[in-house]
């Protein structure tokens, strides 16, 4: 779609991962999608080749998001404009938080709660949980995160609750909320 390529592209990503390399899309996201080590190497080489053919810098932060969709958009824009200056890759969680005044809303909160499917090495690369955690720390609020699984532990002082393994979402959230409330009441010196 050539007319679409002629616009200014603002890509909001949920990760700062580049397209390739040890912190790239294949290495960071492949394992959670079921890719083996061999698969990851093939995927990484494929993304590197795509970047080479498209003349796109694979080290650009955020290009690893959404399976490398930004690579194609950057290539199209470069073909039409001669450079990639019409593609702007921004941290999506931060942009959404800022546009909704989340920092101001968190500022008066004693406890801030968020969730994450899997809390792992990629959580800190721009995911919602990391942005909400930063805002909570800046506001001196207690921060809690509920996740389906924790591969890594959150920062010290964070209340971390693993969701129970059940298909009943209401039950998961009710139990997680209760655990967070108890942990907060047991550790907080200022309640209410």
Question: Residue ranges of each PLM-predicted region?
Answer:
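N-terminal loops that bind phosphate or other acidic moieties
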Residues: 1-192
